[in-house]
Amino acid sequence: MQITPAQSSDRESWNIFVKNNYPPVGVFMQTWEWGEFKKDWGKKIERFFVTDGDQLIAVFMLAEHSLPFGFSYGYLPRGPVLAKTLDQQKINAVFSFIRDWAIQKHSHLVFLRLEPPVQEEVVAELGKKHFLRPDYYIQPRYNLTLDLTKPEEEILASFHSSTRSNLNRAERRGVTVTLKNHQQDVSQSDFWQMTKDTISRNSGKNLYPPRTYFNSMFKVLPALGNETSPDQLSIGTFCGHQHDKPAATHYVLFFGDTATYIYGASATECLKSKVTTYLHWQAAREAKARGFKYYDLGGIDEKLWPSITTFKRQFGGLEFAYVGLIDIPLQPRLYKLYNFLKKLRHLGKS
């Protein structure tokens, strides 16, 4: 096996491999465009091919995250991406090879953090080979996704009766949805005003990234257009209005077979219009019309987000579960210190 850096000329082949070999949920995080966005936001990003002879068997994007005292660690968001043709033995060999490579080539990192989009049984034996499994996770381990390959009437029939009722209520109360181009005619001022309402309803807890994050994302990612290719990550801005008044905004990423809801905000005074339910449905319909197979409503977790989880589950759909984090200590003593300090910070907040 061999690991080689990807070059700028490899964008198309990179995205095609990711599209063809990734499960429905989380695919956008290993696209070329997502890496470019993270670069613009200030992250150090590297991309690598894993080959076996003349066969491409895996790819991964490596993002460096700073730690105190000048140290850092490497994070593979929802990666590495493995070829679907690999059997269990070959998958184990790929993980072991990445570990050996990281020890040799990235010794400046304290540890390497993997987040493979695979099921638990695929990595069940990794703990025997110096891989560690943190008891927390970064990306949601569970996502809820609508199957858009079914007829629209069948998708609607799978919704909870209250969800179908809310869709009808939204139309009766004058809710409309427009897909807009963020690079042309969308002002973020409405979105940021509505985030204040959303944060207030969440007991003041802010789950939004800083504005610089959104600025870089909108700067780098192309807007969803009529000729947008599924081989290129793009973003759709779905604006909901009630009687021409801004009521909610959803941002949805499009790539491969999946449209992925990532962020949204809504005006408190318009919540009774059920605009957020209506926005999800119209975004899913847009994705289906464009030939996408899945609409990912995002993470669910009964303990962390009980109300959001209940809301999303009323859409029916498919639930996907992934293994979470796998750490490879490159400097074991510093890795132990990192975990010790992390636990202290957690105790200090509790």
PLM regions and their residue ranges:
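A conserved beta-strand-loop-helix scaffold within acyl/acetyltransferase catalytic domains
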Residues: A6-G53, F60-F69, K128-Y137, K150-P151, ...
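Active-site/acyl-donor-binding loops of N-acyltransferases
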Residues: Q7-R11, E64, K128-E153, A289-S350
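Short, high-confidence coil segments that cap the C-terminus of an alpha-helix
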Residues: K43-I45, H106-L109, R290-F292
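Glycine-/proline-rich flexible loop or hinge segments
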Residues: S72-T85, H106-F111
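A cross-family glycoside hydrolase active-site/sugar-binding cleft signature
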Residues: P77, L112-E115, I262, G298
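A short, internal acetyl-CoA/4′-phosphopantetheine-binding micro-motif in the GNAT/acyltransferase core
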Residues: P77-D87, T149, G264-S273, D301
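Acyl-donor-binding surface of acyltransferase catalytic domains
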Residues: K90-T176
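Aromatic (often tryptophan-rich) hydrophobic motifs at membrane interfaces
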Residues: A93-D100, Y213-K336
